């Protein structure tokens, strides 16, 4: 939500935006030591907590996502695994949105 905001969630969105700022600052500070710092920004993910929501709420969430479904925890894990791999060695200070296109 740090990338697009949401009504009634000022505190939550502000903390997420703070994490993005921290990520970018740490990337600059630690990059010279060979340390990369990145963030993953998940969209609506089908977690145990989300599964307990009423069906109409889940449908509303799906309707907001361009790919018309909620993400899976494994898809978030895959982004983290990529960032931890050698394939991402030159990626630094980046936020990867794993959100089905919500931030497009």
Give residue ranges: language-model regions.
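Active-site "substrate specificity/gating" loop of NAD(P)-dependent dehydrogenases
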Residues: 1-9, 31
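A short hydrophobic alpha-helix cap/turn motif
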Residues: 30-32, 45, 71, 84
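Short, small/polar-rich loop/turn modules that mediate ligand/substrate recognition or access, typified
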Residues: 31, 36, 91-93
């Amino acid at each position: 939500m740090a990338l697009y905001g949401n009504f009634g969630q000022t505190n939550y969105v502000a903390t997420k935006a703070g994490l993005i700022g921290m990520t970018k600052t740490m990337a600059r500070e630690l990059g010279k030591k060979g340390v990369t710092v990145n963030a993953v920004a998940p969209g609506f993910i089908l977690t145990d907590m989300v599964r307990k929501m009423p069906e109409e709420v889940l449908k509303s969430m799906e309707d907001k996502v361009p790919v018309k479904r909620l993400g899976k925890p494994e898809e978030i894990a895959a982004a983290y695994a990529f960032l931890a791999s050698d394939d991402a060695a030159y990626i630094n200070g980046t936020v990867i949105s794993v959100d089905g296109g919500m931030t497009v």
